[in-house]
């Protein structure tokens, strides 16, 4: 049976592939942090993503007006800062917890689009799960407060990514992803150089950075920009609730990270 590319099921499939790609790659990224740090890892990831997307999307062919450029630039900046905050977070706290806290972004989008009482009940449950993860009580498992703050900052940027990503996709189509990656890479590169210096360009790091660029940015963000054109922002935010569990499983399988019972309960509250 042929599935239309405009079908909601097609868009959902793209999102699932995107989430799997991002979370498996995040485990790889954590192995690079001890070498060059989160800032340089983010910069290289975005740089390679931009290079990979250039010949595919051919953004120079897009005829954009000044008005169309604004959402693309904001999309690129939110992408860059989101990634750097997220990498700073998971360098300090478990991957699954970091993604769960970052989920405050899509959760906020879902709240803004909710109209029914049942929607607010589910959102309240998710907020309760997030409170369980905050380092304000013994159940949080002694999470690093700086890591938590970075994860929440990444969540804010994720909300901006969804908001501006939909507008960027409408303005420039597939070229928006490539242009956004260029903007994000240019914004984060100074932080990477300041943090790691020339070591970020060593041959032991570049192959890993290329893999991150493809599977953490180029592929998933390309898939997401297509999905965002077909799905309402609220639906996108709800579907992304699967991401914390995928992240936790990736952390367990690839990094040997373990979550306590309260943290698993919190994740369950968030994704329900």
Listing of model-derived features with the role each one plays in the protein:
Residues 1-40, 74-77, 81-85, 127-128, ...:
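Glycine-/small-residue-enriched transmembrane alpha-helix faces in small-molecule transporters
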Residues 40-50, 87-117, 154, 234-252:
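Specific alpha-helical transmembrane segments that line the substrate/conduction pathway
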Residues 104, 118-137, 154, 250, ...:
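Hydrophobic transmembrane alpha-helices of multi-pass small-molecule transport proteins
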Residues 11, 35-81, 108-109, 125, ...:
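Transmembrane alpha-helices of multi-pass small-molecule transport proteins
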Residues 2-4, 46, 205, 241-272:
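C-terminal-most transmembrane helix of multi-pass membrane proteins
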Residues 1-20, 50-74, 112-121, 139-143, ...:
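Membrane-interface interhelical linkers
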Residues 32, 41, 45, 89, ...:
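Hydrophobic/aromatic residues within transmembrane alpha-helices
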